[in-house]
Amino acid sequence: LDDDRLATFVEGLRVITIAPELRGAPELIRRLADLGVRVSLGHSAATLPESRAGYDAGAVTTTHLFNAMSGVVHREPGLALAALLDDTVWVELIADTLHVDPELWPLIWNLKPVERVLLVSDAIALAGSGASRGMLGELEVRLDGEMVTLVEGGNLAGSVSALDLELRNVVRAGIPLAHAVRAASRNPAELLGLTDRGRLAPGLRADLVVLDADSFAVRRVMRAGEWIVTA
C-alpha cells in the first residue's frame, strides 16, 4: 500500500497487533508508528532477535503476554522474554487465572516498571450474555464454567472475565493494590494517548468506579462527572 492508502486504512485505529517475524513486518511497523498507531506484538512465533527488531521498529506494547506467542524457553527465548526485558514497552496480562498461572504474575511486576503493565479482559461476546455457545469471528466457541474454548480443537479462545474480577485476582495474588489499579486505569489511558482520563486530577474527566472493599464488586460508576450506575 502507498502511504495515502495505508493512512486511510488505519484511520481511527489506535492499536494493531502484528507478528514481527512476518515478511515486511518491521517496515510496516515503522509506517504504522509514523501514522500514530500503537503497534502491539503478538500472535507470534518470533525469536528473541525478531521480537527486538519489532520493538526497535516502533512497536510499543505486547498482546496478552505469554498467550499465543513464543515464550521463555532457556535455549530458544522468544517474544515473551523480549517483552519482559524491555523496560520501554507495555505488556498486557489476562488475569483470569486461566490464561496465565497466578504464580507468574508477581514475576511480571518484578521485571517490568509499574507503569508498563496493563490488565486486559480479552472478553468476547459470550461475556455476560448468558449463552453457553457462540461465535468468535468464524469460529464456534463454547463456555465451560469460566473457560471459553473452540468447539473444534479445544484451544482457549478469549475470555468471559471482567476487569473488576481481574483486579481482585491480582490483589489476592499479592500485587499491591495501587499497582493493580494503575494497570487497569492510568496505564491503558497513557498507552492510548488519552490524556484526559485514567487518573484523578483537577481538570481531567471524572471517571470513577467504586468497588466493594472485600469482594471488589462494582458498586457505583461515574462517567464524565455523572453517576451512571449506583448500587
Task: Map each language-model feature to its residues.
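Short, structured coil/loop segments at alpha-helix boundaries
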Residues: 25, 86, 101, 176, ...
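Short glycine-rich loop/turn motifs that provide flexible caps or phosphate-binding loops at active sites
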Residues: 41, 57, 157, 192, ...
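His/Asp/Glu-enriched, well-ordered alpha-helical/loop segment
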Residues: 78-93, 97, 109-211
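C-terminal cap of metal-dependent C-N hydrolases
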Residues: 200-231
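Active-site core of metal-dependent hydrolases
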Residues: 1-131, 150
